[in-house]
Each structure stands twice: as C-alpha cells, then as structure tokens.
Amino acid sequence: VGFISTSEAAEAGDSFTSVLADLERRLQQVEEENRMLRERLEPASTPTPPTEPAIDDSGLPVFLQQNPPDGQAKPVTAEPKKEKKWFEKYTVRGYTQLRFNDVLDSDGRGAAHLVGDSSVGDRQSFLLRRVRLIIQGDVSEHVSLYFQPDFAASVPGSPDNAQYAQIRDMYADVHLDDLKELRFRIGQSKVPYGWENLQSSSNRLPLDRNDAMNSAVRNERDLGIFFYWTPVEVQEFFKYVNDAGLKGSGNYGLFGVGVYNGQGGSLREQNDNLHTVARITLPFEYGNGRHAEVGMQGYVGQYAVLSAPISPLGVGAAVRPSGTLEANNEQGLQDERLAWTFVAYPEPIGFQAEWTVGNGPALNAAQTAVEVQSLSGGYAMVMARRKLRKGELLPFARWNYFNGGYKSERNAPMSNIEEWELGLEWQFSKSLELATVYTLTDRTNTTALSSANTRSYQQFEGQLLRCQLQVTW
C-alpha cells in the first residue's frame, strides 16, 4: 500500500509545471512595471558629445599650448586692477617753519634787511616763514597732480598783511611712457635753474637760498611748460638720495628744457616775451658708493622791471628810474645767465657749490636809470652729517657772494653781498628739527625809500643770530 500509482504521479507533475510557468509570467510582469516606473522617475540622460580629435600644439609657444610640458605651466591671466577711489589716489603732507632773528651788531649805515626773510630788521621778532600744505597723487597711469599753497604769504601795503594763502605750485606731470622717463610738466612749478633753487626749503640747511642763484627767478617758480628726461637709473639715484635723508633737490631730470613767463611765481606777466631755460645734471657715485652731481644750466629772455619812486643818491625829490615798466619800458631788458653746479652729498662729509655769470637789469650808479649790466656770484658750503642715538646733527659753513642787479626787487638795485654763515641743524626726529645760524654779513638793503633827500640802497654790515623750528607732517 505506501506507493503512488503511475497516473497519480503524472497528474502531480503537470500541476507543478503549471505553477512554475505562472510564477515566471508574474516575474516578467513585475520587471516590466519596474522598468516603466524608472523611466517616469529618472530624467533622460544627456547625450555625450563626440570626442574631438587631439591637436598637436607642441610647436606653439608655451602660453598657447593646451597641455604644456611639466615646469612650463601656462601663465594665468591677471585679474583686472580694481579702480581706486578718488581719495585713495592722493597724499597730504606739509611743514611749518617758525623763525626768530636778532641783530647782534650793526654799523648804522643801512638798516638790517634780508630779501628772503622779513623778520630780519628793526621791531621784528617771531615770524611764520612758511606754512605749506602739499596735495599730490596720480590722476591716472600717465598723469599726476601736485598742488602746494603757502599760508604764510604777505601782501604789501597794510599792517595786517601777513598769513595769507597763495599758490606756490600747481602743475600736472604728463608721462609719455610707462617707465616715466619722459614727461611734460605743465603749470606753475620751479624753474630748472640752480640746484639750491630746486631743493625744497624743508631740506635746505641754510635758512635762506643764496642771492646769486635765487635772484634769477622770483620765488624760484613761474608759469610755463617744461620737458624732463630722467632715465630709470637716474630716477633710482634721486630716490635713494631722498630716502637716505641726504637732502637732495628732487627729480628734475637728467636733462630739462622749457619756456616760462619770466616775471616770477605769483606775478603777472608784463611783456609778450617768454624766457627759455635748459639744464643738465650728471649724477654719479664715487669712493665706496658715495653720491655726487655736476650740472650746468642757463636761461635767456626779456625782463620787465617794476619800479618805485626814489631820491637819486638821496638828492632831490623821489622819481621813478627810466628803463622800468612804469617809465614806459614795456618790453623789458635783456636777461641772461649761465651757471655751474657741484654737489657731494654728506656721507658723512659733503660739499656744495654753485656759480653764475650773466647780464641783466640793474640800477645805474647815478640811480636814475635801469640798464643792462654784468653780474656774477655764487656760494660754497661744507657740511657734515652725524647720526645720534635719537636724531641727527648737521653742522655747516657757507660763503655767499653776489655782485649785480637784484632784478626781482623794485628798480633792480645794484647789490653787493658777501656773507659768512655758521650753523647747526639738529633733527630730533623726522617731524621736528631746530636750526641755529650765526651770520656775518655785508649786503645792500634793497628797500626803495620814497622820501625826498633820502638815499636808498645803503649797505648793511652786521651780525645776526637766527633760529628756525620746523615741524614736518
């Protein structure tokens, strides 16, 4: 009994086969439903673009190759510079000079007087000699601006004539190349005549400029157009001298040439004639890296002399000399000079000298007419530099000489000047310094006296003690 018959076994096999077929059909149905569900849920795939054939660029420059060799990476293009705001383009600085002068001794012939310092004389004491504000900056890559007013200017003719604002410098430098070797300077600026004239008053050791060179250009400045050529290595020379505190004259080119009105800074032009000036300077190093310059300069033009009534030789009524602008000489008189310069910077001993010759307007011996006469003069100075634990000491001695017409003064008085100066500048810091100078002088008082029977232009001989406190900011 315990065995299955043949017919029953066949029926069981057919039933099992039917179940398997049904399961397989259901599985296929589920897979199809899953496929359709995935297609609805997943986005269509983006077709892959065809691969471009490789280009052989090995023969091109490295910066053009797509895959340069190792160690020769393709340079990265720099991002464009961010434009600066207007107040980020400019710097503001300045300095103030407070003076006190005392006449120690006088021979009594002429009153004490210095062209460059109105506080030398009777009834004088403290004076704000300069109050300068300097604004400068780059307007663009090739144009820079320089503006310097003085708030200690004086206006003649009134007891409250001091401490007025007056423009000293207002010019633009237009650079013709990226290295700034070639540039035009347009506006009111210093005339490139005389190394000491070009040197800033904040850097000069003597309190005033020498008369021979300074009498060439009133206020050292004028309105005009100047061209300067300054090779890169010369720019570096001037920059080093300035940064090292050697009291340089600034960057006025290895070569400069220009035209200007001729009457002097802050004065109106009086004739239809331009002055022409040219200057060359050769900076060099000598003896263990010391720095020096040699130079030559000259100018030519017609100068209109302004006048004031005087009593000729102190006899008779006061009259205006002939040959002056107010005496109908509107074209002016011949004005020409040539000068030489040598400067050895104080490292630690220095020497500085300039000499000029020429022809220019000068009052004649009878004091009745202004005529063209010869002139000559100059100066020589030795100085030293001693660094202290705090600050510096700079002693100096200078001889100053001039014989000729002082054209920028009324009536261009014939002046005879010879003086010796012994001084010491003590720099407590970069922002504070004190200069003390003893002066032994014999010079012409260039003040025109309009009273009848009163002689103008007497000689002043005497001794001066002069002090100046300078604050730089």
Residue ranges and their predicted role:
Residues 1-2:
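Bacterial N-terminal signal peptides
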Residues 11, 51, 56-58, 208-210, ...:
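Alpha-helix initiation/capping motif
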Residues 104-107, 119-120, 158-159, 170-177, ...:
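Outer-membrane beta-barrel pore domains
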